[in-house]
C-alpha cells in the first residue's frame, strides 16, 4: 500500500484557520494545558468505550465512542476543518443538507444500478494518512501530528468519533474526483455515502466492466474494469467482495437501503418490523418488547427512543403527510404519550381548515351581505381579494363547518391596484391551518388547484377545481396567472395552489361571463408586503 504522503502529491491550497497554525494556538483553542495534552497523547485508548450494534442479518458493527473530554476536542477539530472542506457534488454522507435520501434520489428512475462497498472504510484510514492529509493542507507538522493523534485510536480512524466523518470525506476527496471522472466517461451517475458507492444509468453499465455486465445479483469485483478498481486501490481502499451488487431493470433496485422506482421509498420489511414491534408493546407490554430489543441488539437501548427513531426515519423518507408514517406515529403516540411524534396535517387537511368564507355588509343594509373567500397564509395572515371587502362597514369570516361561529375582522392592509387585502383577526390558532408560499417558478402547463366557495349556501363545502396555467401575463404592472379552470363568483380571494399545495396566487376574477380566468401572482403579494 502507498505511504501516507503519496496520497497528497501536491499541497492543497486552503486558508488554514488560526487555531491550527501552531501548537500554542491549538492548545489555546482546546483550552487544555501541554501536560493534559500529553496525558491524552499516551492514554487516549482508555478514553474510548467500545460496543457493537446490529447491522442486520446477524452482523455487528464495532463502535468506538470517545468519552466526554475527548469527544469535545474531536468536535472542535471537526468544526475547524468544516470551512476547509468543500464536498464534491456526488458526496452525500456527513454533509449538511444531504442524506441517505438525497443519495438515493440522485439515482431515481435509473434502470441499472451497481452498488459497491469500501471494505473496512474507517479502519483503512490510518493515523499516518490523517497526519499526511493535515500536512497537505498546509497545517504545521507538529499540529498535524497532534490532530491525527487525537482523532485516531489504535492507529486508525475510529467509527464513533465526531471528527471521523469529515476527515474520512477529506481523505476521499481525490478518489471522489477520479470516480466522478470515470462515471462521466462511462455515461452514468456516481454517488458516495460514506463507504457505500453507487453507479447508475438508464442503460446497462457496460463501460464499467471488462466484459459484458453480469446478471443481476452479487458478482466478483474482478469483473470490473481495472481503472475503476485502481481508483480505490490508489487511494488506499479496497472493494468489499461480499458487497458488490448489480441490478437491472427487471430486478429490485436499492441505493443505501432505499428502494428507487418512481419514488424513493422505504423497504417494506423495515416497516413490517416497526409494526411488529408496536404490536408486541400493544399486546404484551413494554417490558417484553424491551427484552426482545436487548436480545436482538445485545445491549440496553431505550425502547421508546428506538421506535421513535425508526418511525421518524420513515417520515423523513416518505414525507410527514404519508399515511403509513401517520399510522405508525399515531400508534406510537398512544403507547408513549410523553414522547409524542409530531404528526403534520395532510394537504387535504390543511386546505379544509385554511380556507374560510368571508362575508361583508355595506352601508345600505337592504343590499344584504356579499360573500367571497379568504385563506390563512404563513408569515402573512388572513388574505383575501380587496374587492371582496371594499366598501364594507362590517366584515365577518367563518369556517363552513361552523357557519354560526362567525369572527369579526377588519382590514389591516389593502392595495386596490393589486386587488389584495390582509385582514386583522383574533381567531384562535387552534381553529385553522396555514398554507406555505410557493417557491416554484411557474410556466404555462403547470398544474394548479383553485379553492373557494362559489355561491356558498348552507351545507356547502370547499370547492376544489383543478386545471393548468395557460399564461403568465402582466396587467398594469401586476403579475397574473391565467388558468384553465373557471373561477366562479365567490371564489375570489381564495388560494390558487401549486402541485405541492403551496399558494401560487390569489383568485382574482373569472366565471361563465368572463372570457378568461385570472389569479394575482403570489409574488405581487410578497412584493407589496415587503414595502408596505
For the regions a language model picked out, list residue spans one by one.
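A generic structural motif
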Residues: 195-199, 382-384, 419-426, 481-483
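A structural micro-motif recognizing beta-strand termini
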Residues: 359-364, 387, 402, 423-430, ...
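Flexible, gly/ser-rich surface segments that form the specificity/activation loops bordering the active-site cleft
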Residues: 431-480, 486-492, 507-518
